[in-house]
C-alpha cells in the first residue's frame, strides 16, 4: 500500500482530532473543520459500531505516526511479546521511532518532514548517521542534526516553532547545538489521552 500524500486536513477531519500532520504555525482548528467529516457535504458523523470504533482508533494511530498497515501489525506483534500492557507497549514502540523522536525534538515541523530528514541522512544517533526512520531510539541516546545539515532553513524554522510549543518531558534539547537526549522511555501518562489503544488491541485480538 502506498503512503498517503493527499490533503492532511482530510485525514484529521476523518478522525475528528488533530493528528499533528500540519506544521503548527497556526492551530489546526483554524485550518481544518474537525467537527465535520471530509468531503463537500461532510456532515455530522454517524454512530459507529464497536468494530467501526476499533477500526477508527487504529487508523488514527497509524496516521498520527505515519505507519503503514504491515509495519503497524508488526509493532503490535512485538508489543504482544513484551511484558506489561500490550496497548501501552504499542504506543511506546511508536514513540521510540527515530522519525518521531526527531519530530519531538523539533528538527522537523511534522513527522513526515522528520522522516524525510532521516532518510536524507541529516540525522545522527550517538554520533553515527542513521537513515532508517523506524530505528528504535533507546533511553539516553543522543539525537542530533548533522553539522552539514544545520543551515537548512526548514530545520531552523521547525526548531523555532518547537521552542514556542515546548518540548515533552522525556527529551532534552539544546536548540543552539541542534542536539538532544532521549532521556527516558515515556510512560502512558505522558502520552495523548485522545488515543484509546485498548480498542486497537481488541481489534487485533479477534
Swiss-Prot record:
Biological process annotations from GO:
ribosomal small subunit biogenesis; translation
User: SUPFAM superfamilies, per this entry?
Assistant: Alpha-L RNA-binding motif (SSF55174)
Write out the ranges of the annotated region (Disordered).
Answer: 27-47
Entry-linked Pfam families: Ribosomal_S4 (PF00163), S4 (PF01479)
For this UniProt entry, what's an example GO CC term? small ribosomal subunit
The record's CDD domains line, in alphabetical order, gives: S4
The record's keywords, sorted A to Z, are: Ribonucleoprotein, Ribosomal protein, RNA-binding, rRNA-binding
Which parts of the sequence belong to the S4 RNA-binding domain? 96-158
Q: Which Gene3D superfamilies does the entry link to?
A: Ribosomal Protein S4 Delta 41, Chain A, domain 1, RNA-binding S4 domain
Any idea which GO molecular function terms this record carries? rRNA binding; structural constituent of ribosome
- The cysteines covalently paired via disulfide bonds are none
Which InterPro entries does the entry link to? Ribosomal_uS4, Ribosomal_uS4_bac-type, Ribosomal_uS4_CS, Ribosomal_uS4_N, S4_RNA-bd, S4_RNA-bd_sf
Provide the assembly information.
Part of the 30S ribosomal subunit. Contacts protein S5. The interaction surface between S4 and S5 is involved in control of translational fidelity.
The record's NCBIfam families line, in alphabetical order, gives: PRK05327.1, rpsD_bact
Query: Belongs to which family?
Result: Belongs to the universal ribosomal protein uS4 family.
Q: What does this protein do?
A: One of the primary rRNA binding proteins, it binds directly to 16S rRNA where it nucleates assembly of the body of the 30S subunit.
Name of the protein this chain belongs to: Small ribosomal subunit protein uS4
Gene name as annotated: rpsD
